[in-house]
Amino acid sequence: MAVAGAMVMSGGVLLLLLAFTCAAYNDAGELPPISRRSFPKGFIFGTSSSSYQFEGAAAKGGRGPSIWDTFTHQYPDKITDKSNGDGACNSYHLYKEDVRIMKEMGMDAYRFSISWSRILPNGSLSGGVNREGINYYNNLINELLSKEVQPFATLFHFDTPQALEDKYKGFLSPNIINDYKDYAEICFKEFGDRVKHWITFNEPWNFCSMGYASGTMAPGRCSSWEKGKCRVGDSGREPYTACHHQLLAHAETVRLYKEKYQFTEEAIRQSPFIRDNNLNRRSAKALQKGRIGIILNSEWFVPFSQSKSSNDAARRVLDFMLGWFMDPLIRGDYPLSMRELVGNRLPEFSKEQSEMVKGAFDFIGLNYYASSYADNDPPSYGHNNSYNTDSHAKITGSRNGIPIGPQAASFWFYIYPEGLRELLLHIKENYGNPTIYITENGVDEINNKTMRLKEALKDDIRIEYYHKHLLALLSAMRDGANVKGYFAWSLLDNFEWSEGYTVRFGINFVDYDNGMKRYPKNSARWFKKFLRK
């Protein structure tokens, strides 16, 4: 699941997009062929997952509850089908089968997330480390490596330990920074000899906007007038506070990893830890030398009209979604538009914090799914403060009754492959062309329980979606975007947060009523052919 980004499109860019769209088809109206060989040597292809959506075994193996366990059980009406991730798709027990599927498809890598409360059941070191959790992830990592699949490990994918939510309100408290860093260090120590790509946080935009502004995702906090009609929360302040603490936790953890575990040549030259502890070059080079980054999600937003107000609105939406995180990571502070419009509700970085956050990544993960239109929407006099209105922009999937692209199963999902290209080029031109991995990209279909299995496996819309987005990605790379890998969402059908099991994102079908049996969809067969070396 992913969300938005925005920038102005001039007439020249529109012509370029039209040319790209037309060039995507040959004279017969077919998409041009594409395969692994179309991409540079060493380009990584994989699939992604997350612990709560995939693992199941929610109360097994010593795992403590997360905020998603609490949210789905206390507020089942906030989930479309009133379901939860207690069983998910049972990857906790079926991980070997899942790795076999990846290997047979020809995938190079697998991005999974580690459940914080499976490692530290009460969220902090004081409650002890759960060795069963350590053993599970060791087994998963070893199984991946035995099948020549690279592990990409995400440390946080929306699932704050409930114990920390109870103790000090989770990411609303700066206390979580040290607890998160302690948890991350356990993972570096236990798995870092084999995991060479680490992600600190997945989609902080989703976590903070949906969890603290709209209240439609855990922990389900918002102002009473917002969509989630929450019992507690402040949609005008809490989203900014939570994400401020995530950025600080990210930066602290990146510094920890670089100084104690990574030891690249640059770190060896610059690190006071190495110098102060008299670590010589030989011992430093023998350590992990992995890479660490963060995953951001963004839509592409097209101005609703050619007016200046529409163009400015599109820029603001981008600032409030992608720039919220990229600006601090590149420039050390939030975008000017956010500082002006949010005012004192937006936390400030100290000089030391600004320097720490700036440049705190080896790569950026980008999750892209869909695009929308953006138009100017100034607030009315005396309006209530909320992140959802602070950008003074209105977002819509249609213009004059015509959608920006075909609508997928989810209400927010308008398919627009060109948006991936434009988003990548925007990052290239505005943020110094960092190393990027596309860490999620995919499309959902309705979970039609009356459909026969044979028909459910015919997901031609998904094949077309991947084909067009890979063409868009290749076009951006040819124009200089620094992309090193692509991960499809997702390997399997799974629990899709507030939509429960009502939609299916998998390239492999999961039969939830028959032992979680996996079946390859047509898109899985397409990927296998695409990935053939």
UniProtKB/Swiss-Prot annotation:
Record: active site: 203 (proton donor), 440 (nucleophile)
Disulfide pattern: 222-230
Gene3D superfamilies found in the cross-reference section: Glycosidases
EC number: 3.2.1.21
Residue positions binding a beta-D-glucoside: 53, 157, 202-203, 369, 440, 489, 496-497, 505
GO MF, one annotated term: beta-glucosidase activity
Any one GO biological process: carbohydrate metabolic process
Residues listed as glycosylation sites in the UniProt record: 122, 384, 448
Keywords noted in UniProt: Disulfide bond, Glycoprotein, Glycosidase, Hydrolase, Signal
Record's signal peptide: 1-23
Catalytic reaction(s) noted: Hydrolysis of terminal, non-reducing beta-D-glucosyl residues with release of beta-D-glucose
InterPro entries given in the database record: Glyco_hydro_1, Glyco_hydro_1_N_CS, Glycoside_hydrolase_SF
Homology family: Belongs to the glycosyl hydrolase 1 family.
Name used for this protein in its record: Beta-glucosidase 10
Native organism: Oryza sativa subsp. japonica
